[in-house]
Amino acid sequence: MVLTPDGEEFMDYARDILNRINKLEHSYRDGSHKKRKFGISVPRACYISAAFAEFSKNIGDGDVEIYYKETNSKKTIQKVLDNEYKLGIIRYSEAYDKHYKTMLEEKGLNCELVAEFSYVLIMSRDNPLASKETITYDDLSSYIEIAHADPYVPTLSMSKVFREELPDKIGQRIFVFERASQFDLLSENPKTFMWVSSASDKILDRYNLVQRVCEGNKKTYKDVLIYHKGYRLSKLDKDFITALCEARRKFLK
């Protein structure tokens, strides 16, 4: 059988299609066509979100899906256990370090210290406390505290955790679950304040806020990275951790 010119052109076209199909099948078999994925569940913290923003600038051109969840430690632990997220960062008072480490070991999770710090106060530049040379706990009693409504410590009742994390001296509190609303409240209401890990100058300037130390505040907190034992960190995981360490050095001095 002799192919006509049109037939030869058709066969060349068909061979080209078959070659493309074979290459596509090969890429799926060897994993080179897999969409990259990254997910992390974290506390509501400026330095962590800043790290995430920097990380997002360097994800490259390939297909990728990224998930970033802000929530409390209890939910983060559960999400990592359920493999909903491969990485998590939990925050807790140093006083409960043993509680957490015991629980994480029992659940088969690795834990690595990310940061250790004391909370500072943030408030509007128009807050009367902002101009005080020294701020004490008693000074805060006539102001409105912005707080997160979901503190958690393993083996302790929620009521006990609330008593320890949210002292009775403060008569007025507004509870929030995400950071955007807390900054709007702090910016617009000069009677409000909040305990936070250090915020960046960029955030403070954006919302017309100041950051102050409270005299007598000695409590130390830890942020800890968690993931399943045996889990191999991906390149995206490592890139995020690098950005996280850089943000920690910059923010938590």
Report the location of each language-model feature:
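Beta-alpha-beta core module
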Residues: E106-E112, F117, A180-G230
